[in-house]
Regions:
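Nucleotide/phosphate-binding site architecture used for ATP/NTP-dependent chemistry
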Residues: 1-49, 56-59, 63, 77-196
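Canonical protein kinase catalytic loop motif
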Residues: 63, 68-70
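Hydrophobic residue at the +6 position relative to the catalytic HRD Asp in the kinase catalytic loop
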Residues: 72-74
């Protein structure tokens, strides 16, 4: 981010205080016939910026950058939609044994479960901030928000391996491991079944 002009870039951590998430929602709600759908569109875009994009790298290569609240920057287009995400710190996390381990800008974690625990820990504050903002400005329910998070992860685990021509079984396993890591933090990212 140090090399980027700051026009239309904003740090996710500052987005609530500056009213940017509410502004995104109001713009979408004004253009759509249903405010609930507008809320889901905005929430999905923000969720994708935090967890969806990093999941693409995780499911295809078993690596991750830091999607932490203070590290993630958002770029909006002329219509107020998200078109890019950026990082203040581009350090990549890998698992010991990865060919990148020991390279500059790379931190090796001791095992794959440690990578999921770290990533869930880094995603939670940003996702929680977005969830609270969307509940406040759009009335999006907590349950629906966390379901959208789970759908983003499952979507990445499903589609990225096909598009990147990587192992789909490995991608699905990594996606489920990430969902489990978020669940272990108490986040309800799996859909619940209704029994009648």
């Amino acid at each position: 981010m140090a090399e980027q002009g700051k026009r239309r870039w904003w740090r996710l951590a500052d987005g609530i205080r500056e009213g940017r998430i509410e502004l995104m929602y109001r713009r979408h709600a004004a253009e759509m016939s249903n405010a609930d759908i507008a809320a889901e569109v905005v929430a999905t875009a923000l969720i994708h910026a935090v967890v969806g994009r990093v999941m693409a790298l995780l499911v295809s290569e078993g690596r991750a950058w830091d999607p932490g609240l203070e590290n993630l920057w958002i770029h909006t287009d002329n219509d107020g939609g998200i078109d890019w995400a950026g990082l203040a710190d581009t350090t990549i996390r890998v698992v010991d044994g990865d060919v990148l381990a020991g390279e500059p800008g790379v931190v090796a974690l001791p095992c794959e479960p440690a990578l999921y625990v770290w990533l869930a820990h880094r995603c939670e504050p940003a996702l929680s901030l977005i969830q609270h903002a969307m509940a406040h400005c759009a009335g999006l329910s907590e349950r629906r928000f966390w379901t959208l998070v789970g759908e983003s992860i499952v979507g990445a685990a499903t589609y990225v391996p096909a598009l990147a021509r990587t192992n789909s079984i490995e991608g699905a396993r990594r996606g489920q491991a990430m969902i489990a890591a978020l669940e272990e933090r108490g986040l309800p990212v799996r859909r619940t079944c209704f029994v009648r």
